């Protein structure tokens, strides 16, 4: 019985921590939606530019 209670307590603690993390992450995104979008676009641009740079290297 003690083991069952311990497992339930751990699961409850994990769910609370996960919920808090999710909410704090959502708040950050809502506070800075433009900066998040800029970061994502910059990452996407970097990914797009990598194959082009490789092709230029091969042409030279």
Curated annotation (Swiss-Prot):
Protein name, UniProt field: Venom protein 4.1
Compartment(s) of residence: Secreted
Record has Signal as a keyword: yes
Region forming the signal peptide: 1-26
Cysteine pairs bridged by disulfides in the record: none
Record family assignment: Belongs to the non-disulfide-bridged peptide (NDBP) superfamily.
Tissue expr: Expressed by the venom gland.
Subcellular location, principal: secreted
Keyword vocabulary terms for this entry: Secreted, Signal
One GO CC annotation: extracellular region
């Amino acid at each position: 019985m003690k083991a069952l209670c311990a497992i339930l307590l751990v699961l409850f603690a994990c769910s609370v921590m996960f919920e808090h993390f999710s909410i704090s992450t959502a708040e950050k995104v809502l506070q800075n939606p433009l900066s998040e979008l800029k970061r994502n676009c910059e990452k996407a641009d970097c990914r797009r530019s990598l194959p082009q740079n490789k092709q230029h290297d091969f042409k030279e």
